Design a protein with these regions (language model features):
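Active-site lining segments of carbohydrate-active enzymes
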Residues: 53, 59-132, 210-257
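Acidic, His- and aromatic-enriched active-site or binding-groove loops in soluble protein domains
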Residues: 40-48, 52-57
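Conserved small/polar residues in nucleotide/adenosyl-binding loops
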Residues: 258-265
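The feature captures the catalytic groove of carbohydrate-active enzymes
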Residues: 25-44, 89-142, 150-217
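Alpha-helical scaffold segments in carbohydrate-active enzymes
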Residues: 4-15, 70-73, 77, 146-158, ...
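Hydrophobic (often cysteine-bearing) scaffold residues that line and stabilize catalytic clefts
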Residues: 2-5, 47, 60, 64, ...
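Acidic/polar, glycine-enriched structural segments that form the non-catalytic walls/loops
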Residues: 1-42, 61-82, 206-209
Length: 265
């Protein structure tokens, strides 16, 4: 049964993410109406990423290409979002995206679940993941590195250099859960990964040594993960976790079950 379930997951991705087509969205290709829940869009706060966790790791690298092509369409509008909302270089996205290049927060909605500036960098980590599995240096040089580098630049500009010398992602949110906060664990996990990706990519290509040193310096001074009074990994910057909370989003644990790294190994 477990093997059947595993292969069924691969089948779903194979069927809904073919090269030259759109990536898998919330309902894939199986929705039977013109419209559907959440407009059948792309949710960048774990849903689209979750769709692609089995791509490279189960030998379906070609299924990752529609996602990368889609990410490339977000760069230009994402540059405007980065500049207009954050005064930052590079590009980013927010909680939702669509085929028309939507990258801003949903301004009519509650920012506690809708504000997610790390959505763009999280998407960009899949670009490095594709290279990491394929070792396609031509892809990295011609397509991948620019996506990763510009996402890292946004991340650097979004960080707050605190008086104590550390860096934190502020403001930030734990997707769809809790308050707007200073340096939630999920945001720091994405920051660590995109900076590690940019550092490694620049080393592979032998470029941007000066900027690489900046990324390394920030990475070394990023606020560390914290353990709370229950022995849990804190979700927010302070110990406000409730052990009775059964919310479906646990993005702060992404370093334990996705390709995001808890630290450099």
């Amino acid at each position: 049964l477990e093997e059947l379930y595993f292969q069924f997951g691969r089948y779903l991705l194979i069927a809904s993410s073919r090269p030259g087509n759109m990536p898998a969205n919330l309902q894939g290709i199986w929705h039977n109406n013109v419209d559907g829940p959440w407009r059948v869009d792309y949710h960048n706060n774990i849903n689209i990423q979750m769709n692609y966790w089995p791509a490279c790791s189960t030998n379906l690298e070609e299924c990752m290409l529609p996602l990368i092509d889609f990410i490339r369409t977000l760069v230009k509008p994402g540059e405007k979002t980065a500049q207009s909302y954050f005064g930052a270089r590079g590009w980013t996205a927010s909680i939702s995206a669509n085929i028309f290049g939507f990258t801003t927060p949903l301004e009519s909605q509650d920012m506690s679940w809708n504000f997610n500036p790390m959505a763009g960098p999280w998407l960009a980590t899949h670009v490095w993941e594709y290279y990491d599995y394929t070792r396609d240096k031509k892809f990295l040089k011609e397509i991948g590195y620019d996506l990763i580098k510009s996402s890292a630049q946004f991340t650097v500009d979004h960080l707050w250099h605190k008086p104590d010398g550390t860096y934190t992602a502020a403001p930030s949110t734990s997707p769809e859960h809790g308050p707007v906060d200073e340096g939630v664990t999920f945001a720091h996990a994405v920051v660590r990964e995109i900076l590690l990706d940019a550092i490694q990519a620049s080393k592979v290509l032998g470029v941007d040594r000066k900027e690489r040193r900046q990324w390394e310096n920030i990475l070394a001074k990023l606020v560390p993960y914290r353990i709370g009074r229950y022995g849990q990994l804190l979700e927010w910057s302070t110990d406000i976790d409730d052990p009775k909370d059964e919310h479906r989003h646990v993005n702060h644990l992404s370093v334990s079950y996705t390709h995001l790294r808890a630290h450099e190994t």
